[in-house]
Amino acid sequence: MLRRFLLGILVVSLASMAWAGVPDLVLSQAEIPAGADGALVFSTPNAQGEAFTAAFAPGGAVVDATISVTLIDTNGDPIFLYPFEDLWLETSLGSLSYCSGGTVADQSTDEMGMTTFSNPIAGGSYTDPASEMTMVMVAGAPISGGGVDVQFNSPDISGDLTVNLTDIVFFTDMLGGDFTDNPLFAGDFNYDGQINLSDIVRFTPGIGAACP
């Protein structure tokens, strides 16, 4: 009887050890600061856009849209030193284009299982504020919960990860009020609801930008 009891304990212990360090996508969490819902992060393929700490709220006010992640394993314990390169951002409709490694976490998880996304990303194209969310991917699978409401746009309007003549034409059309090919959001780089000189100032330095 004792032998059978000890064997049962051993089996349970081994099972628990086997799941230790394996992310549980339901228990794990991703969140943004209060007041950052719908914030825009201006991005470029060469990662010279804005940090998440300098995102724009609808209307143009600067807000902190840092994405905080807590990674929990299937035993309910925080995962320490989960590799930052295995944590990255995608968007729910796939609109965000990004370079290899261009949306990875700031660092590997700490002893509390936490890390952040705050650095400028290397990416392009634009998302759909009406229906798209940002997903935190863990080794290729998204954390449950539907994602966080962070949006992106870029001088790389076409999303081919190079800011070139195509993007200049697209931006010029939008500047002139022609939104046939792209919506206003695609060229409203400070999210103030209009395309004007402030957007030209952001677009122009990005010309020629490409993945690192």
Please report, for each region that a protein language model flagged, where it lies by residue.
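Cellulosome-associated attachment modules in secreted, modular CAZymes
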Residues: A20-P212
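Intrinsically disordered, low-complexity regulatory segments enriched
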Residues: L6-I9, L93
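Bacterial N-terminal signal peptides
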Residues: G8-M17
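Positively charged n-region of N-terminal signal peptides that target proteins for export
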Residues: M1-R4
